[in-house]
């Protein structure tokens, strides 16, 4: 990496070399049977330069041809955007624990057993269901060096497991599933199994819900499906700068329910998305986006922060080794004190949304979302009475989250980077056949 940096500095004012290496072993089940076990390794080397005030970029999968990588960055700098920022100097990072060596010690046999237990438990509850499952362990490292003297590295581990099932009866298709991610080994699938069996139990009966406006409970999965995309895009520093965010002039204003607090926080030990620094070498931090209903911060990388006249929030994220852009690290929605059962008991007639298909349709930047309810349940007189079919919902995230009835005490990680409780809202528009 130092060779690439030194070669680049002969032709530019500033330079940065980013390296990401990973090794993953996934165990895959398909149609209730073990299908595949494989090991994969990947490396990405990315060079970003500032030459004649413009940004150049090149990427490779190894360091064997440093001259070619530098030439690529120099060539692209002729057409690159103007660099309004400076690369970060060495700085203090929080001691965020991201690596557990125990992950790499989990044997393939143990992983196969965990996956088989998931499949056996779900098919044992429903002999007709077809399941795909996966158990994976991975480790990796990120290194960034730059011309300001920054030289930073961290190692990470990730263990994940999950299952998805499809139950087909005639023209009726039921989809269920759950998963878990951690920087520690996951030794048991009990929680996943319980969640999927609960989905199957609630879906045994079918129930019709009339078109109109009804109260709605979004489960943690439902929150992730329906509400997160409009919110995260609106808080992006890039969208704010482009004038596309409806929140662009709203800092300090109370636009949401006072019960709602949302933070971008990748500083917690051993969480799957945690890290000491972002993909530009800037220290990550806990950034409140919404604090008790008040719009408090936007998130930035170096480039957008410079354009906005502020500091990076440590949200410079790369996709596949590409140029950094503002991105959420780990979105944490604060829990409330209402149980899921208490929410259900409060509703005479309403809807539970667990999985939404096509939730990112509509004017996302305006907060709109709509989609088909892939997995949802009807509530009657404080009880779940069955699964709804052929039902669509549409709403606006700003209106919904301003009129919150309760926030659940049942927070959990949904995927690797969203922590969400259930959210009970007073009304949503429903269209049912």
Each model region followed by its residue ranges:
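N-terminal small-residue-enriched
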Residues: 1-433
């Amino acid at each position: 990496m130092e060779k690439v940096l030194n070669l680049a500095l002969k032709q530019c004012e500033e330079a940065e070399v980013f390296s990401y290496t990973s090794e993953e072993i996934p165990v895959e089940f398909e149609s209730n049977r073990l299908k595949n076990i494989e090991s994969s390794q990947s490396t990405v080397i990315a060079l970003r330069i500032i030459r004649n005030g413009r940004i150049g970029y090149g990427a490779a999968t190894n360091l064997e041809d440093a001259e070619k990588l530098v030439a690529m960055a120099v060539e692209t700098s002729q057409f690159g955007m103007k660099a309004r920022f400076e690369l970060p100097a060495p700085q203090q990072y929080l001691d965020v624990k991201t690596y557990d060596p125990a992950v790499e010690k989990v044997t393939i046999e143990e992983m196969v057993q965990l996956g088989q237990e998931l499949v056996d438990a779900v098919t044992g509850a429903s002999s007709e269901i077809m399941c795909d499952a996966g158990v994976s362990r991975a480790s990796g490292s990120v290194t960034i060096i730059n011309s300001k003297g920054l030289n930073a590295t961290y190692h990470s581990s990730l263990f994940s497991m999950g299952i998805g099932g499809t139950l087909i009866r005639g023209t009726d298709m039921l989809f269920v599933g759950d998963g878990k991610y951690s920087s520690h080994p996951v030794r048991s699938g009990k929680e996943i199994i319980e969640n999927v069996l609960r989905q199957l139990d609630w879906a045994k009966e079918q129930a019709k819900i009339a078109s109109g406006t009804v109260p709605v409970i979004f489960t943690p999965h439902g929150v992730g499906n329906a509400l997160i995309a409009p919110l995260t895009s609106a808080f992006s520093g890039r969208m704010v700068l482009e004038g596309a965010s409806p929140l662009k002039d709203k800092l300090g204003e109370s636009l949401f329910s006072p019960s709602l607090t949302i933070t971008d926080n990748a500083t917690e030990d051993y969480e799957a998305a945690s890290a000491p620094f972002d993909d530009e070498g800037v220290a990550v931090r806990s950034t409140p986006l919404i604090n008790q209903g008040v719009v408090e911060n936007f998130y930035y990388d170096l480039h957008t922060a410079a354009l906005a006249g502020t500091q990076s929030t440590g949200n410079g994220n790369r996709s596949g080794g590409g140029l950094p852009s503002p991105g959420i690290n780990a979105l944490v929605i604060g829990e409330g004190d209402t149980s899921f059962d208490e929410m259900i008991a409060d509703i005479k007639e309403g809807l539970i949304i667990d999985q939404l298909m096509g939730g990112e349709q509509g004017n996302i930047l305006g907060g709109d979302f709509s989609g088909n309810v892939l997995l949802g349940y009807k509530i009657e007189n404080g009880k779940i009475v069955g699964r709804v079919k052929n039902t669509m919902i549409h709403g606006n995230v700003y209106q919904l989250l301003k009129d919150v009835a309760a926030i659940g005490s049942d927070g959990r990680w949904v995927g690797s980077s969203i922590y969400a409780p259930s959210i009970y809202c007073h009304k949503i528009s429903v269209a049912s056949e």
